[in-house]
Swiss-Prot record:
This is Small ribosomal subunit protein uS15. It comes from the Bacteria. One of its GO terms (biological process) is translation. Keywords: Ribonucleoprotein, Ribosomal protein, RNA-binding, rRNA-binding. GO terms for molecular function: rRNA binding; structural constituent of ribosome. Part of the 30S ribosomal subunit. Forms a bridge to the 50S subunit in the 70S ribosome, contacting the 23S rRNA. SUPFAM superfamilies: S15/NS1 RNA-binding domain. Residues 1-21 have a biased composition (Basic and acidic residues). The keyword Nucleotidyltransferase does not apply. One of the primary rRNA binding proteins, it binds directly to 16S rRNA where it helps nucleate assembly of the platform of the 30S subunit by binding and bridging several RNA helices of the 16S rRNA. Forms an intersubunit bridge (bridge B4) with the 23S rRNA of the 50S subunit in the ribosome.
Amino acid sequence: MALTTEEKKQVLSEYGLHETDTGSPEAQVAMLTKRIVDLTEHLKMHKHDHHSRRGLLLLVGRRRRLLKYVQKVDIERYRSLIERLGLRR
């Protein structure tokens, strides 16, 4: 599911480094997390939507790679990010 402009602005204002930040790893991970949560809710209702399930797996993989990068570059930023997002890693 695509995010609306308002949802994107809300996520970026909370997790971005500045107001117009869309490229930092934190902002990207937060956007992916929002999309993953929305898609997970969709798949709970539409169990046979395998096309969306594959898209979900791709998003999870992309988020995992970005988190691995943040962990490698700055472990404190990584710990702060997963705590703020409520991820299990």
